[in-house]
Amino acid sequence: MKSTGLLLGYFLMKVLVCDAEGEPGKSLDGAVTASGSNDSRDGENGLSETPHTEDRCRGYYDVMGQWDPPFVCRTGSYLYCCGTCGFRFCCEFKNSRLDQTTCKNYDTPPWSMTGRPPPKMMDQHDPTKDKTNLIVYIICGVVAIMALVGIFTKLGLEKAHRPHRENMSRALAQVMRQTAPGEHVEREESLAVHGQPYENLQARATGNNLQSAQMNSVGPSSSMMQAMTPYPALGQVPVAHPYEPSPAAKELNKYASLKAVAEKANENFYTNRRHLADLAAKGTLPMHSVSLEQEPTNPYSPELPCQKQNGHKSKSTKVHSSHPLAYGSNTIANPGRMSSWETTETLGRRHTYGPKKHSATMEQMNELTSAQSQHYLPPHPYFVTNSKTEVTV
């Protein structure tokens, strides 16, 4: 009873299902037969097919000859290996699935297996047979040797000419120091005859020595007298190099210019002194004092002035010397010692002194200094009338 009740319930259920799907069912037997056939087909399909979860693409060589490693398609709905043999990828459509068994690109293609080509005969290079570097080395070596030879030659020539130049400088120094005997005697005579009466005053000897050292840079005594020589002996002048100026000519030009300066200073001194002597002889004196420059003198030369009578005017002669005259310090400091008439008488007076030696003592120098006449300009005012009978008040 129970089994029959179950079967009836089952059939009723099937009938209801068939009506809901709109399937025609003419009879219960036909419906039962149709339903039985459908159930059998569903059972066969469930047993033969399983759900697809992933697909694996094999590794292959692509069209460039590069190896692509294998990979698995299991991301989301992309579960199938699709594409071509040379390019593979994952897709979600089963009908686009690639049959990988038909592809042949799983091995290395023969065209990609290229070996190293054999070397050509033209590309072979033998360093031992190449002579280009050797030629370059030879040229550079020759140039370096020539440069060294030139440098050493120049150094040798300079060393060879150096002793000659030293000998020339020494010979020039000897020529300037040595003078002819005749010229030395003539200089002594001229200095003895034309010596000035004021050249023995040594009150300002220190200042005179400094001025003389600045003018000609010549040493005392014999060195100074030798520097006054106009030209050395022709036989003693060394032969200079043809391409450079002679040192002897330079020295001679230097001393000639210094000599001209000394002569000009002497002319200025004697011009002022002669003007004062003329005014004193006429009996008239200027309103203002006449400035007299220091008379050039040579403190190392012997003195031999000539004696003149009183009342006669002495002619002033020039002595080629670069030392200025040293006046006594009491010439202007004590103006009351001499009067105007004594000045007039003193200007025309010359004292004679014999030649002295260089070893004169200081006492003799003081006596000679006190014996020399002193220039004095009166401090009293007077007027110039150019008259012989002028009277000073």
Swiss-Prot record:
<keyword id="KW-0732">Signal</keyword>
<dbReference type="InterPro" id="IPR026910">
    <property type="entry name" value="Shisa"/>
</dbReference>
<feature type="transmembrane region" description="Helical">
    <location>
        <begin position="132"/>
        <end position="152"/>
    </location>
</feature>
<feature type="topological domain" description="Extracellular">
    <location>
        <begin position="21"/>
        <end position="131"/>
    </location>
</feature>
<dbReference type="InterPro" id="IPR053891">
    <property type="entry name" value="Shisa_N"/>
</dbReference>
<feature type="region of interest" description="Disordered">
    <location>
        <begin position="307"/>
        <end position="340"/>
    </location>
</feature>
<dbReference type="GO" id="GO:0045211">
    <property type="term" value="C:postsynaptic membrane"/>
</dbReference>
<keyword id="KW-0770">Synapse</keyword>
<keyword id="KW-1133">Transmembrane helix</keyword>
<keyword id="KW-1003">Cell membrane</keyword>
<feature type="region of interest" description="Disordered">
    <location>
        <begin position="28"/>
        <end position="52"/>
    </location>
</feature>
<comment type="subunit">
    <text>Component of some AMPA receptors (ionotropic glutamate receptors) complex.</text>
</comment>
<comment type="function">
    <text>Regulator of short-term neuronal synaptic plasticity in the dentate gyrus. Associates with AMPA receptors (ionotropic glutamate receptors) in synaptic spines and promotes AMPA receptor desensitization at excitatory synapses.</text>
</comment>
<feature type="glycosylation site" description="N-linked (GlcNAc...) asparagine">
    <location>
        <position position="38"/>
    </location>
</feature>
<dbReference type="GO" id="GO:0032591">
    <property type="term" value="C:dendritic spine membrane"/>
</dbReference>
<feature type="signal peptide">
    <location>
        <begin position="1"/>
        <end position="20"/>
    </location>
</feature>
<comment type="similarity">
    <text>Belongs to the shisa family. SHISA9 subfamily.</text>
</comment>
<keyword id="KW-0325">Glycoprotein</keyword>
<dbReference type="GO" id="GO:0008328">
    <property type="term" value="C:ionotropic glutamate receptor complex"/>
</dbReference>
<keyword id="KW-0628">Postsynaptic cell membrane</keyword>
<keyword id="KW-0472">Membrane</keyword>
<feature type="compositionally biased region" description="Basic residues">
    <location>
        <begin position="310"/>
        <end position="321"/>
    </location>
</feature>
<protein>
    <recommendedName>
        <fullName>Protein shisa-9B</fullName>
    </recommendedName>
</protein>
<dbReference type="GO" id="GO:0032281">
    <property type="term" value="C:AMPA glutamate receptor complex"/>
</dbReference>
<keyword id="KW-0812">Transmembrane</keyword>
<dbReference type="Pfam" id="PF13908">
    <property type="entry name" value="Shisa_N"/>
</dbReference>
<dbReference type="GO" id="GO:0014069">
    <property type="term" value="C:postsynaptic density"/>
</dbReference>
<dbReference type="GO" id="GO:0048172">
    <property type="term" value="P:regulation of short-term neuronal synaptic plasticity"/>
</dbReference>
<dbReference type="GO" id="GO:0045202">
    <property type="term" value="C:synapse"/>
</dbReference>
<keyword id="KW-0966">Cell projection</keyword>
<feature type="topological domain" description="Cytoplasmic">
    <location>
        <begin position="153"/>
        <end position="393"/>
    </location>
</feature>
